[in-house]
Every structure is written in C-alpha cells, then in structure tokens.
C-alpha cells in the first residue's frame, strides 16, 4: 500500500522531478564553461550593449511566452546564460564591473525575464492565466471568453515590450555614466 501510494504520487508529481533534473545539467554546463563561452561570444560582438542584449532577450521571451514556449526561468536560464552575456557586453565596452553595476545588470536581466513571461503568457489562448481570468469573469456574469482575454492582452504585451526596451536604454546610459567615471578614475 505504501509503495503504491509513493508510486502514484511520484507519477502525478513528475513535473517536480523534471525540475530537479535540470539542476545538475545547469551545474555541469557551468562547470564546463558555458558561462565563459557566452561571455566570449558577447565580447566578440562589438556593437552589442547590455541594454540591446536584454531587449533582444525580452522580445524572445515575450514571443516565446505568447506561443507557450517555456525557456525555464531565473535559475535555469538567466543566471547561467543571459546574465553572464549581459555582464560580458558591459565588460567588453567598459572594462571591469564593480559590485553595484554587476547587481544592477543581474536585477535588470531578471526583470526582463519576468516582464516577458508575465505579459507574454496571457497572449496565448490556452494559458492558465487566460483560462482563470475568463472563468472568473464568466462566473461573475460577464460575457467574455478566452479569445477576448487573449486579444485584450496583446496591446499590454506590446506596451510592456516598449517599456522594457526603454528601461534597457536607460540602463545603457546609466552604465555608461557610472563606468565611464570608473575608467577615468583608474587613468
């Protein structure tokens, strides 16, 4: 009876097991230099700024969420790949980063992931958020369906993309201001 219960619980909760399996894969990628290769790739792209890279990622994340393509998230994608690439872009342009600017880039990279996922996922007709909103509104007597919610989410997703790109442009300006001062102080 106990083994049967454990087996059925394991099968019903296998998504948790899949999540746990991604952690060693991420560790192996980090151990064998994925982070360094990502930084080298970005350093070789001369015109790629931190803000441009994060804007591209925001666009990809939002489009991916709109078609229900999951790119994992903070621990599986931002920390091992996007954040090092964004920092590599700043290092190639300005030299070494101090802790304050490193944290600024980390936070912005995480924010772009959140914006893209949060505002992009409701564009997908069958996403859980759209179905929850449609079901709740129907129960309250409003005549809406999932398609109406998804259509109403498109302008919001576009606005979120525009605001994210503006935030990234301001990030580039802030990094330029902060790190150009640091470069001059070193000279």
Please place each PLM-identified region on the residue numbering:
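Short helix-coil transition sites and intra-membrane helix breaks within transmembrane domains
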Residues: 14-15, 27-36, 66-80, 118-127
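Membrane-interfacial helix-loop connectors
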Residues: 75-100, 127-148
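Hydrophobic transmembrane alpha-helices of multi-pass solute/ion transporters
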Residues: 1-29, 37-41, 179, 183-187
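Hydrophobic core segments of alpha-helical transmembrane domains in multi-pass membrane transport
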Residues: 22-26, 57-65, 130-136, 152-169
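Juxtamembrane and boundary regions of transmembrane helices in multi-pass small-molecule transporters
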Residues: 70, 74, 137-187
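Hydrophobic alpha-helical transmembrane segments of multi-pass integral membrane proteins
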Residues: 45-90
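Alpha-helical transmembrane segments of multi-pass membrane proteins
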Residues: 51-65, 94-119, 144-158
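Intrinsically disordered, low-complexity non-transmembrane regions of multi-pass membrane transporters
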Residues: 87-108, 169-187
């Amino acid at each position: 009876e106990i083994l049967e219960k454990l087996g059925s619980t394991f099968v019903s909760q296998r998504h948790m097991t899949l999540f746990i399996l991604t952690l060693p894969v991420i560790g192996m990628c980090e151990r064998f230099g994925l982070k360094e290769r990502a930084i080298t790739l970005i350093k070789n792209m001369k015109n790629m700024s931190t803000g441009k890279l994060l804007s591209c990622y925001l666009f990809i994340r939002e489009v991916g969420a709109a078609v229900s393509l999951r790119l994992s998230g903070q621990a599986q994608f931002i920390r091992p790949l996007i954040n090092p690439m964004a920092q590599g872009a700043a290092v190639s342009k300005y030299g070494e980063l101090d802790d304050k600017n490193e944290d600024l880039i980390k936070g912005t990279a995480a924010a772009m992931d959140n914006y893209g996922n949060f505002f992009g996922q409701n564009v997908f007709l069958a996403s859980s958020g759209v179905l929850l909103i449609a079901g709740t509104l129907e129960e309250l007597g409003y005549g809406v369906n999932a398609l109406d919610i998804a259509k109403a989410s498109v302008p919001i997703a576009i606005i979120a993309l525009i605001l994210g790109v503006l935030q990234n442009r301001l990030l580039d300006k802030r990094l330029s201001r902060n790190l150009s001062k640091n470069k001059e102080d070193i000279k």
